[in-house]
Amino acid sequence: MKVRVRLAPSPTGTLHIGTARTAVFNWLFARHQGGQFLLRIEDTDKERSKPEFTTNILEGLKWLGLNWDEQPIIQSQHVDDHRAAIQKLLDRDLAYRCYASETELEAMRETQKAQGKAPRYDNRHRDLNPEQEAAFQSEGRTAVVRFRIDDDATISWKDLVRGPMHWKGSDLGGDMVISRRAPAKEIGDPLYNLVVVVDDAAMSISHVIRGEDHIANTAKQLLIYEALGLPIPQFAHTPLILNSEGRKLSKRDGVTSISDFQAMGYTAEAMANYMSLLGWSVPEGTDERFTLQQAATVFSFDRVNKAGAKFDWDKLNWLNSQVLHDLPKDQLLHELKPLWSKAGWALPEENWCLDLAELLGPSLTLLKDGVDQARPFFEEPTLQADGLEQLAVDGAKAGLSNLLDQLDRTSWDGFDVKQAQQLLTNAAQAANVKKGVIMKSLRAALLGRLQGPDLITTWGLLARIGQDLNRLRRCL
């Protein structure tokens, strides 16, 4: 059997991390099996679906490296196929028109609640005779189409994550609406559970991999597969992503959109790596840091957890820092340059920028940190409290004054590290303080603070653009 999986996002919002994690699991399984990863845009919600959300979803998947193997299917372009399937069910008496008004249905639900029962459709129009239907039609009533569900039916499947699953027809809330209201003898807009069955069959989907919040939908859809005589795929229901309190991650928890993570400075490699670990355990002896291609070689559903996966910011930050630390300086500069330009900085020559990227790389957690940490290299720094305190230490300014005098008398071809170290030693001796005092004071003068990357390299970079002497003079 050829493995064909699909991601089927609705363009009613930006690419959510839950949808992206589902995409990662689908992609990993397809690549591990030598199969195909497909994309279907479920845009049948006409009011909420927007082209800009489709663009955001596609761009987010591309950014993560989740390439798909065929042209994306646009669900709304296949509505005639969906209506044809509904008509087939009507013709076989496996579905029927329900004329109950919204007011009547709400009254039904309120009565059920008052009786302590779970709200469900009571199948009141399941067996209307022609005269009853004609009477409703003469009133001008519109109708939904409902799919018949036998309360005594048992729905079973072997879930690739959860094992054997069993549902009763009585658990599904009564006969299921499969199309919206429309005038009598017409079929309104087809609804989700019918539509995805028709589309998955048309796309020859072999495995449906999605979140556990779809388990009840799977039970309903299996009945539709059987009623339409369509081949039934295998199902895998992955765990939900949870917040720190153990509840489903939602917009109320803050950042959940992939484009937001991207804007915050997370790399595609770290995001894809982390999402792979949200609910999947790597085989023993396997490093938790990997590329998608590496993960695909060992991915299997027997290591996907049933329990929800808590979102761990610390782990994501660690993974992102490791990616940034290991990036070659040219690749890191490629990521940082647009951010530096956006900050309004005129960039010096390429080699200087490469050396700055290399200097900052080991201290970055997020790409945006590369803006904050680069700022004193492009802008005159403001002395922070710790910098001011350091410059007030006995001998600090005397040492810097001596260093400045030495620099005024020094002629070097480029910045010489050994010579720079000797100048610091000389300044410390002249001021009768430890060399560390001079080094801290120099850092305060150059960067405005005591925290920062390697001092000598920092000094060298600023010297190359003629900023070291200016900053020393400012502090004296």
Swiss-Prot record:
Primary location group: cytoplasm
Span of the annotated motif 'HIGH' region: 9-19
Residues annotated as binding ATP: 251
Function, as annotated: Catalyzes the attachment of glutamate to tRNA(Glu) in a two-step reaction: glutamate is first activated by ATP to form Glu-AMP and then transferred to the acceptor end of tRNA(Glu).
UniProt keyword Zinc-finger present: no
Name listed for the protein in its UniProt record: Glutamate--tRNA ligase
Catalyzed reaction equations: tRNA(Glu) + L-glutamate + ATP = L-glutamyl-tRNA(Glu) + AMP + diphosphate
Gene3D superfamilies reported for this sequence: 1.10.10.350, Glutamate-tRNA synthetase, class I, anticodon-binding domain 1 (1.10.8.70), Glutamyl-trna Synthetase, Domain 2 (1.10.1160.10), Glutamyl-tRNA Synthetase, Domain 3 (3.90.800.10), HUPs (3.40.50.620)
UniProt-listed Pfam families: Anticodon_2, tRNA-synt_1c
InterPro entries noted in UniProt: aa-tRNA-synth_I_cd-bd (IPR045462), aa-tRNA-synth_I_codon-bd_sub2 (IPR020751), aa-tRNA-synth_I_CS (IPR001412), aa_tRNA-synth_I_cd-bd_sf (IPR008925), Glu-tRNA-ligase_bac/mito (IPR004527), Glu-tRNA-synth_I_codon-bd_sub1 (IPR020752), Glu/Gln-tRNA-synth (IPR000924), Glu/Gln-tRNA-synth_Ib_cat-dom (IPR020058)
UniProt GO cellular component terms: cytosol
Species name: Prochlorococcus marinus (strain MIT 9313)
Gene (name only): gltX
GO molecular function term, any single one: ATP binding
Location of this chain's protein in the cell: Cytoplasm
Keyword ATP-binding attributed: yes
